Amino acid sequence: MAQYASYRWLKTRKNRLNTQCEVKDMDEIYETQPERTDLPLVVIPVIIESMIESFEKNFELFKDIARVRMYKDFTLDEDTIVARCVEADAIIVIGFHCADSILDRLNAKCYAFGGTGVASYIDLNKAKERGIRVCNVV
C-alpha cells in the first residue's frame, strides 16, 4: 500500500486542492483519487520541475472526472515512460517524443501535449489510424 507523505505536506496539498491525494513515493509520484478506480487514469510520466506546482494547482479540475498520476522527475528512457503509462487512458506529454515504438506498446486513447509543435513529437497519421486523440493541454 502506498505511503502517505508527512501530515503537514499532505494537509497543505489537501487544503490547496480540496481533494484527496496520495503520494506513493514522496519524491517521485503524486496521485489524486487513487481509490476511484472507476475513473479513467491520466498519467504525466515525466515533468519539468518548474511545472510541478502549476499542474498541482489544477488537479482539482479533474475531481470526479479522472484520476491523475504525475511522476515528479524527468527521463527520456522509453522503457521507463512506457512502464509508467501502461495503465493510462490518457497521457499528458511534456518534453519527450512519442516515438512509434511508444504508441505500439500503449493503449492510451488520448495524448495531450504541454507545448506547441505537436506534429514534431508524435506521428499524427499513426495516431489517427489507431483512433488516438492528440491535443494540447490548454
Q: Where do the protein language model's features map onto the residues?
A:
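N-terminal glycine-/charge-rich "phosphate-binding" loop or analogous flexible N-terminal tail
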Residues: 2-88
